């Protein structure tokens, strides 16, 4: 037997995808990752998604080791099959000869440059560990994957030619965003699927910019990453301390949204979910754990989020969102985030937010892709502008049939968290009247402009929907 019964149940959403299958999941479980990170907090989302995905051996090195025991406990509680420990002098040598090992360097420009150049000194074209470089600085960052030593050495040289501070500005949600992208790149390396991100992916979550940089442009984008002129995070933090965000769904999408918002210190998170934790949730729903299987998702999420940020207020709504309770639940929140897994409740939530004049941040995920948009009532499109008619039940792939790569919801949830912060602080450029499409296999982000539908039955010129409606439940989009 390739996997035991518990592993089959845990990784079912991976196994049913032919690109992974049972053999691929076994390969993931046998793989090893070396993580070099400035702080434990920087590495938190990355480690959780690696553990959830089943990476068998995780070795960590932190400049600041405070609270690493708590992180290791959370990772093991999420998935008891993995091993996680600090890197010692023997660690790289124990795994460097394995074809299923890679290295991640995550942190500020100065830190990444230091670690890369240390590796260049000790390695060569015959002894090289495939490496993922993840640079973060406030809203900006840069990601690149190297499977050839010469390309890695050239990038390290480019970084060494610039003078970066050892520790730059706080990473905001770029920590979560980069961590999930790194986890995806690890799986692609291990399984040899998709296209590795061999050109630098530069991103700016404040303005929703995603650019693939050629080698000759790398220095330019490193300099852009280093800049922090357009936003002072200390001012933004002051504006979100009292922010109240409602997350509808504490699953695949709700997990990364809640984690990212907790890490940046928002005031209140409300969680709506009536379900309980199951083992099949744990390849992607990082708020939960093996020890909390059977517990309500909202309570399980509260336990984890309080361990991350004891000061945050968590309001639990252990209920199914319905026509009767939607307005009452939404009423006391500033922003609503859609982490749902079905069309009927999405339409209900969209309508309720429109009538209550609440911004709604939407996302959906399936297999290796995701999309997101931001809906501001009476200022742009609504969900019904995109899909005037609800899809018939069974017309799309069901949850059980489609599968999903565990870290993909993490990418989209991080985007949703960034949108919530920008709306609350009144900064940057949101996804209003735009859709962001993400293809994990190619690490591509595509922005599509939208127009408000003047014939929309809810927000158009002649609306015909004037009250909330109840629909039959179905499950066609995975979260």
Predicted feature residues:
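Adenine nucleotide-associated cytosolic modules
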Residues: 1-479
């Amino acid at each position: 037997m390739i996997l035991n019964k518990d592993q089959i149940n845990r990784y079912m959403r991976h196994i049913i995808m032919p690109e992974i299958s049972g053999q691929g999941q076994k390969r993931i479980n046998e793989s090893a990752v070396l993580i070099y990170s400035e702080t434990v907090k920087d590495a938190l989302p990355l480690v959780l998604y690696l553990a959830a995905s089943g990476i068998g051996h995780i070795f960590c090195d932190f400049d600041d080791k405070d609270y690493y025991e708590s992180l290791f406990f959370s990772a093991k509680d999420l998935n008891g099959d993995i091993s996680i420990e600090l890197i010692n002098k023997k660690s790289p040598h124990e795994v460097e000869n394995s074809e299923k090992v890679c290295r991640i360097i995550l942190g500020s420009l100065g830190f990444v440059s230091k670690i890369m150049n240390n590796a260049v000194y000790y390695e060569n074209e015959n002894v090289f560990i495939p490496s993922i470089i993840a640079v973060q600085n406030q809203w900006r960052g840069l990601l690149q994957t190297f499977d050839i030593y010469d390309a890695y050495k050239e990038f390290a040289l480019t970084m060494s030619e610039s003078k970066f501070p050892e520790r730059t500005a706080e990473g905001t949600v770029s920590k979560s965003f980069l961590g999930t992208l790194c986890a995806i790149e690890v799986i692609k390396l291990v399984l040899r699927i998709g296209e590795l991100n061999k050109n630098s992916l530069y991103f700016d979550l404040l303005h929703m910019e995603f650019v693939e940089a050629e080698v000759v442009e790398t220095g330019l984008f490193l300099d852009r990453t280093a800049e922090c002129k357009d936003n002072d995070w200390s001012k933004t933090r002051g504006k979100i301390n009292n922010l109240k965000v409602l997350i509808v769904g504490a699953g695949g999408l709700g997990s990364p949204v809640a984690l990212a918002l907790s890490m940046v210190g928002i005031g209140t998170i409300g969680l709506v979910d009536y379900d309980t934790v199951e083992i099949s949730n744990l390849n992607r729903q990082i708020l939960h754990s093996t020890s909390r299987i059977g517990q309500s998702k909202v309570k399980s999420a509260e336990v984890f989020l309080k361990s991350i940020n004891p000061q945050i207020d968590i309001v639990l709504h252990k209920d199914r969102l319905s026509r009767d309770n939607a307005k009452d639940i939404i009423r006391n929140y500033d922003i609503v985030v859609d982490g749902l897994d079905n069309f009927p409740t999405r339409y209900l939530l969209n309508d309720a937010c429109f009538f209550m004049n609440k911004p709604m941040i939407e996302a959906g995920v399936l297999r290796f892709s995701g999309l997101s948009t931001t809906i501001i009532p009476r200022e742009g499109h609504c969900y019904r502008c995109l899909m005037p008619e609800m899809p018939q039940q069974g017309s799309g792939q069901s949850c059980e049939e489609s599968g999903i790569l565990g870290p993909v919801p993490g990418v989209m949830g991080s985007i949703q968290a960034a949108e919530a912060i920008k709306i609350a602080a009144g900064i940057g450029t949101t996804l209003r009247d735009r859709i962001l499409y993400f293809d994990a296999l190619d690490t591509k982000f595509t922005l599509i402009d939208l127009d408000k539908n003047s014939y929309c039955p809810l927000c158009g010129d002649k609306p015909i929907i004037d009250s909330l409606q109840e629909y039959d439940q179905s499950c066609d989009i995975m979260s």
